[in-house]
Amino acid sequence: MNSSVQGYRRVVVKLGTSVLTSGSKSLDKAHMVELARQMAGLMKSGVEVVLVTSGAIAAGREHLGYPVLPDTMANKQLLAAVGQSQLILAWSQLFSIYGLHVGQLLLTRADLHDRERYLNARDTLNALLAQGIVPIINENDAVATTEIKVGDNDNLSARAALLCDADLLMLLTDQKGLFDADPRKEPNARLIPEVEHIDDSLRLLAGGSVSGLGTGGMATKLQAADIARRAGVEVIIASGHHPEVIKKAVHREAVGTRFLAIESPLESRKQWILAGPKAKGRLLLDIGAVAAVTCRGRSLLSKGITGVEGQFERGDTLELVSPDGRVVARGMARYQSQALNLIAGKHSDEIEPLLGYDYGDAVVHRNDMVVLEMIGEAK
């Protein structure tokens, strides 16, 4: 694609259940066609669009006549299985009005965890976009269990943005954006128009949606924004009912809260470490190790580990945790958990005598690590 609008050549649009139902129990087809019109307009102007859509369970309930069912995983998966076909049919019909075809990708965390499957999903996305087809992504709720679920479509959309190397991620919701206080409780709450850095004070501002139909609140949107912007993707959180919201966002008009992308984004493999695999365990670090890996770009050595949590194998993804409980980095383990329990707190020259082998001094190498928060001083 050679064309772009305001520098955007590829955009991911995430639509939450509250947007698609307009707060009701049914899909709001009139609003969906308006959103399809805006996305089709982008496609016609040369901007590629990937749609991440919620609403399968709501569509399933509607199609089955709103049955009264126990709130179990099996029944949620039943509704998702019925509703997903209705949801993709609705989108297919709506985009066909504008001469566009759609292609469906149903993903689970397992598709993102495995590097080969991750790359295959990326190839499929790129192939669809190359043919002018709108990829429509949803989590495969009909088969996903707690262990393999991404968990919410906010985080799924961030991972989709990384998969397809998007320039912009729009998280469209039932809120106007991120406020400096809860607008439902504070009438004088003000919209935050632009965010350069995501820190603990900003996370405290993130509240939840009141619709009750979706799984994502403002906190999950902030998580998604943090993932995407680290990969060089700009993010906008805005109301899906704001007039011409998609067009305005792409033309950089004042709408919602815009999160600026980090200027030096992660390379592809580190993007996958950040957003793909589920962390299988945690390494607790002393403050010296935290400063070394976050501020000085060092690999993690066994000496700086004060505790090991979880069971994991060599190559699994881990969270690195500061003494005050903050996750400061993610990285790939060079030793399994059983071995790390033996060498935690030990000097590197003690690894081989203790284990009978060694894979090098680094427990997590800096090339296999993504720093999330800088703590300490660079020296």
UniProtKB/Swiss-Prot annotation:
Binding-site list for ATP: K14, T173, D174, T215, G216, G217, M218, A219, T220, K221
PROSITE patterns: GLUTAMATE_5_KINASE, PUA
Compartment(s) where it occurs, according to its Swiss-Prot or TrEMBL record: Cytoplasm
Claim: tRNA processing is one of the keywords in the record: no
GO BP annotations listed: L-proline biosynthetic process
Cellular component, GO annotation: cytosol
Pathway as given in its UniProt record: Amino-acid biosynthesis; L-proline biosynthesis; L-glutamate 5-semialdehyde from L-glutamate: step 1/2
Documented EC number(s): 2.7.2.11
Pfam families hit by this protein: AA_kinase, PUA
Catalytic activity: L-glutamate + ATP = L-glutamyl 5-phosphate + ADP
Domain PUA: 280-358
Enzyme class name: transferase
Keyword Repressor: no
Keywords from the named record: Amino-acid biosynthesis, ATP-binding, Cytoplasm, Kinase, Nucleotide-binding, Proline biosynthesis, Transferase
Family under the similarity heading: Belongs to the glutamate 5-kinase family.
NCBIfam families for this protein: proB (TIGR01027)
Record-given protein name: Glutamate 5-kinase
Source organism (scientific name): Shewanella amazonensis (strain ATCC BAA-1098 / SB2B)
Organism phylogeny: Bacteria, Pseudomonadati, Pseudomonadota, Gammaproteobacteria, Alteromonadales
